[in-house]
């Protein structure tokens, strides 16, 4: 992330990291979204337009206020159950923000080569110059269709 695209304060980045670690928490050998630097991916997305910058700043402020940020409390000091309840309340109160937060978290997470490797996908090799792409072999999706969900239902 370049300095020109910084739209979150250090406190907001820390809060965002904690929040996205609840959206995609670490499980077994899969890392949580916060530990992969997805907050920077989300900040880049938020910086793309002024309306998104406002949406994410207001949404993070809502989470901070609801968690008692600025006091001895705060999001990170809540139990996981309390964090999840707080995020559910934000989802109801500000669905546009929450939908974008989820979307950008998943976009950032599932485009990381480390995640591709851990879930068993091979990153395709680049085609040589001038080559035409082959049509999708839908049987390649069988592996995904047949596996158990590895995401957290909320």
Feature locations, PLM:
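N-terminal module-boundary/linker segments of secreted carbohydrate-active enzymes
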Residues: 2-10
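An acidic intrinsically disordered interaction segment
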Residues: 1-2, 73
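Mature-region segments of soluble proteins
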Residues: 14, 18, 22, 30, ...
């Amino acid at each position: 992330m370049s300095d020109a695209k910084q739209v979150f304060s250090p406190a907001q980045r820390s809060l965002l990291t904690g929040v996205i670690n609840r959206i995609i928490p670490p499980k077994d050998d899969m890392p949580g979204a916060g530990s992969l630097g997805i907050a920077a991916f989300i900040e880049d997305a938020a910086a793309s337009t002024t309306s998104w910058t406002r949406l994410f700043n207001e949404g993070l402020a809502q989470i901070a206020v609801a968690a008692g940020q600025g006091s001895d409390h705060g999001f990170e000091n809540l139990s996981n159950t309390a964090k999840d309840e707080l995020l559910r309340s934000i989802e109801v109160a500000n669905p546009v923000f929450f939908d974008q937060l989820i979307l950008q978290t998943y976009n950032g997470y599932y485009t990381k080569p480390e995640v591709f490797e851990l879930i068993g996908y091979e990153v395709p090799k680049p085609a040589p110059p001038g080559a035409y792409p082959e049509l999708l072999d839908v049987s390649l999706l069988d592996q995904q269709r047949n596996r158990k969900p590895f995401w957290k239902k909320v």
